[in-house]
Amino acid sequence: MAAAGGLPASATLLLLVIAAVAVAPLASAVRPVSDAHRSAAAELFAASPDGSFGDLETTYEAVRTFQILGVEKDKGLIGKACKFAAEKLASSSSSPAKDLFHAARISGVLKCSVDSGVYDDVATRLKAVIKDTNSLLELYYSVGGLLSIKEQGHNVVLPDADNTFHAIKALSQSDGRWRYDTNSAESSTFAAGIALEALSAVISLADSEVDSSMIAVVKNDIVKLFDTIKSYDDGTFYFDEKHVDAAEYKGPITTSASVVRGVTSFAAVASGKLNIPGEKILGLAKFFLGIGLPGSAKDCFNQIESLSFLENNRVFVPLVLSLPSKVFSLTSKDQLKVEVTTVFGSAAPPLRVNLVQVLGSDSKVITTETKELQFDLDNNVHYLDIAPLKIDVGKYSLVFEISLQEQEHETIYATGGTNTEAIFVTGLIKVDKAEIGISDNDAGTVESVQKIDLQKDTSVSLSANHLQKLRLSFQLSTPLGKTFKPHQVFLKLKHDESKVEHLFVVPGSARQFKIVLDFLGLVEKFYYLSGRYDLELAVGDAAMENSFLRALGHIELDLPEAPEKAPKPPAQAVDPFSKFGPKKEISHIFRSPEKRPPKELSFAFTGLTLLPIVGFLIGLMRLGVNLKNFPSLPAPAAFASLFHAGIGAVLLLYVLFWIKLDLFTTLKYLSFLGVFLVFVGHRALSYLSSTSAKQKTA
């Protein structure tokens, strides 16, 4: 029994998610080429902002991959690729054979319009390279370029084909591999592939038949080459280098692709059939399909082009058995469906698919009864009901046997005989005989036992002290009644006040799952925290369709006081996003208004306020008001009128301040009126002063 304290609340859910999705690795899924490969190719071979794919080699790999997959590209990109290839073909004689080789192949794939005179010049240059070189790569690029020009409808003949054939064959080794040139000490499997492809081009370009004895020798070399092939236990075959420098090492994908191109190209032009076992051709197809979606443009090209050569070749056409789904539900009564197609998903010839053996996860034989799968012609799928197989939840290996119905197809197609596929079966797990209770520590006498239903949340209420134990037990059984042991079974206790959590693994035996928590030994792990603990049970497994996280109720624990040096409960993690949540609402009550004075007092105060104005008016009446000194000239009269109007405006602003305006607004208006009054008042008073001075002097 293990305990863990202070885990976050999401820990149990995380464990259940892991249990639900962590299906043990099945055999690598082998599925035909699909739209997913087309999408991956379009992404991996993305054109740069200027519309190009890079150098000539990358451009050819892009357009060739798109051609095989049927991916439509923008006409502008095609035009730029054609222009790129045409410029290289028409360039000076200094262009290497490699560039001419790729440019000619780009032109062939895109059907670019190239002048016949340009091709004649390129052919002459490539033939000159063939005469002067002993390099396998130079010979490969030269004869490959000539073959590409010929395939575009131009008359190209290799006049000395036998000598070229012998020059390439002279670089072969006794184990079926090739050297890159006469000075190379090491041989290469990758070089063997390009050598075979070059030899097939020589045969196609020859103006007469190549020596049949030399072709027979090359066929024997191919058999030796396939003796060096490597394999996995699932029937996958691949080629890899043995002893080459790090700079020359290509990797299994590139090396296998080179051999597939070379062997299928040579088989297409050589008379007779190559003596290669069909299971090895099928294994190579499984290798390239097992890559899935490649991660680089180079791997994508090698995968797709190799599969295109295997799709239609004169050795054997591989037929791939695949399962659309490898997970089956006993609850839904899913059917076992099997597809047998070519690597690109084309329909297979008439055949039978039999299920001959079912193996358990421990390789134990479940059944050996042969069952023939029915064929659905409309959907091109073979199917079988899994209920009669009497298989339970878990992992199984199914062994299928494929047999062609027509004998002549056995020399054309490779089925591999038997094929093993891993599947995973799920179902509803029965949960019963669940009990929870408290027992004494010494005698083990159960004080209270409650039967609970784990198919739904329960609300048991228990109480215990540190001298007692908590007991929980239940049974799990599969749809066929066998004991089921899930990957994850946990009991969680969560302290209500401190939120500290404790997880315990619930051990299982052959009959039941049972856990006993002895609180006397757990007081320190519980940090001596008494109080209410919520109980939760988590049961999860990938094969269990009804995995659950179930609330059981709570238990009141009475634990002793913590000693002085006892460990403190861990601080609970603070959610960093909690500060962005809603804030606490602030409640504020304004104070009650002051008690207002009586009306009579208010009226009396108002009267006293108006008393100075009344006195002012009485004074004016006693003294008398006259306009004798009011200016008579137009300009001074205007300034005097504006001055009095400004004073009136100030008085009006004063009234508005008490009625409507605030202090800041009033001061703003008053500042403008003050400047106005100073100006017009100064002009009016200046006129009166000058008039008074004139009267005194007169």
UniProtKB/Swiss-Prot annotation:
GO terms for biological process: protein N-linked glycosylation; response to cold. It is a multi-pass membrane protein. This is Dolichyl-diphosphooligosaccharide--protein glycosyltransferase subunit 2. Belongs to the SWP1 family. The keyword Protease does not apply. It comes from Oryza sativa subsp. japonica. Residues 30-600, 660 are lumenal. One of its GO terms (cellular component) is oligosaccharyltransferase complex. Component of the oligosaccharyltransferase (OST) complex. It is found in: Endoplasmic reticulum membrane. It comes from the Eukaryota. The chain crosses the membrane at residues 601-621, 639-659, 661-681. Subunit of the oligosaccharyl transferase (OST) complex that catalyzes the initial transfer of a defined glycan (Glc(3)Man(9)GlcNAc(2) in eukaryotes) from the lipid carrier dolichol-pyrophosphate to an asparagine residue within an Asn-X-Ser/Thr consensus motif in nascent polypeptide chains, the first step in protein N-glycosylation. N-glycosylation occurs cotranslationally and the complex associates with the Sec61 complex at the channel-forming translocon complex that mediates protein translocation across the endoplasmic reticulum (ER). All subunits are required for a maximal enzyme activity. Keywords: Endoplasmic reticulum, Membrane, Signal, Transmembrane, Transmembrane helix. Residues 1-29 form the signal peptide. Its main location: endoplasmic reticulum. Pathway: Protein modification; protein glycosylation. Pfam families: Ribophorin_II, Ribophorin_II_2nd, Ribophorin_II_3rd, Ribophorin_II_C. InterPro entries: Ribophorin_II_2nd (IPR055375), Ribophorin_II_3rd (IPR055374), Ribophorin_II_C (IPR056790), Ribophorin_II_N (IPR055373), Swp1 (IPR008814).
